[in-house]
Design a protein with these regions (language model features):
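Short gly/ser-rich loop at a beta-strand->alpha-helix junction or flexible surface loop bordering the NTP-binding
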Residues: 1-210, 335-363
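Surface segments flanking catalytic/ligand-binding clefts of nucleic-acid enzymes
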Residues: 192-363
Length: 363
């Protein structure tokens, strides 16, 4: 059996058509976060909890964690999952003696936002942040204690029972130290989608505050798309970016067509110029009869208008071979529509992906 050649970062392949906002200080029982409510956000959310995805550079521990989680990836997770995480963290905060505000992955849970993929921050204990390095050296049975010298009262919100939580912008920025750029991008988009912050607030924080891993935050901001409607859509878009496939619009409303009730027909990702649409199908797309029929009708209508609609499932994002096959499929469709080969790279480091996107925006 012949040995496989070593793949180098950034190696190009050619695919042609013949190849396949602030937290309120009072508890609103009907609002978000048991008192971490934001006034201008809708009172519902149904998104998937994020799970780690296998990528180059993973350690053995990362791979084992991924394999343990694989069976759960195919289960549809509703808003209840976020509420359960929040309730567990909330109760732990009540019972613990904490030297500082809740931060990092614990604050993500308190904000009722999906956790990012591939983060080194674990949830077996609470995470808190202090400004005094002497406090960070004290062993705590209840929490991991982090030190951030830039912490002050502007960054802390309080619940009615006196629990301090880092605001959304500080939470996102401090997560950068233990999170890859793709996970940081996904976390930022989730916070924006749930109304916890805005892209401009995140950018202002990065530009005006002092903390570690600013370059990683700038890269994540470059890759961010506030129109993304779910974590899986973000993962799908970033997968294509990593293989050098650009030009996709998130949550694209197709002009000239709508459902019978007048609702716009949207695509998770779309290349409007070439009429290529990509739809992420979670388990509810096949288990819900109404949803399945609605999806089938939508795709028939789009195909009659010349669109090519590609369905994506968790399997397509589950590991690098499946991600590569998905990217090659999209590249082949583009090549067929353009009538010429399409250059496809092997997975690029996120720094290079962000740099390329910045260059394209300047053109």
């Amino acid at each position: 059996m012949s040995s496989q050649p070593v793949r180098k970062w950034g190696t190009c392949l050619e695919i042609d058509s013949h190849q396949s906002t602030g937290i309120s200080t009072s508890i609103d029982p009907n609002g978000f976060c048991h008192g971490l409510s934001t006034a201008d956000t809708p009172l519902s959310c149904v998104f998937c909890i994020l799970r780690p995805q296998p990528r180059f550079g993973w350690t053995t521990t990362n791979v084992l964690q991924y394999r343990r989680n694989m069976n759960e990836m195919y289960k549809p997770l509703m808003a209840r999952s976020l509420e359960e995480r929040q309730s567990i963290t909330w109760e732990a905060c009540r019972e613990a003696v904490l030297p500082g505000p809740v931060s990092h992955i614990s604050a993500v849970d308190m904000w009722k936002v999906e956790q990012p993929l591939q983060t080194s921050f674990v949830s077996d204990k609470l995470h808190v942040t202090v400004s005094d390095p002497r406090l960070s050296r004290l062993a705590s049975p209840d929490a991991y204690v982090h030190c951030w010298s830039g912490l002050d009262s502007r960054h802390i919100r309080y619940t009615t029972d006196g629990i301090g939580v880092l605001n959304a912008e500080a939470t996102w920025a401090l997560m950068a130290k233990g999170t890859q750029v793709d996970g940081l991008t996904e976390l930022g988009e989730s916070m924006i989608r749930h109304g916890r912050t805005t892209e401009s607030k995140l950018r202002d924080f990065v530009e005006n505050e002092t903390f570690q891993c600013k370059a990683k935050c700038y890269d994540a901001l470059t890759l961010m798309d506030s129109r993304s409607d779910s974590p899986k859509e973000t993962q799908t878009r970033l997968c294509l970016y990593s293989y050098g496939l650009w030009g996709f619009t998130s949550n694209y409303s197709v002009p000239g067509i709508s459902f019978d009730n007048g609702a716009a027909i949207t695509l998770d990702l779309a290349d409007p110029e070439l009429l290529i649409g990509i739809e992420y199908d979670g388990d509810h797309h096949r288990t819900d009869r109404t949803q399945w029929r609605r999806d089938a009708w939508k795709r028939r209508q789009l195909e009659s208008m010349g669109w090519t609609v590609v369905s994506v499932t968790q399997l397509d994002l589950s590991d690098e071979p499946h991600r590569a096959a998905f990217a090659m499929n999209i590249a082949a469709i583009r090549a067929r529509k353009l009538g010429r080969p399409i250059a496809l790279s092997t997975p690029l480091p996120w720094r290079k992906v962000a740099c390329r996107m910045r260059r394209m925006r300047r053109i």
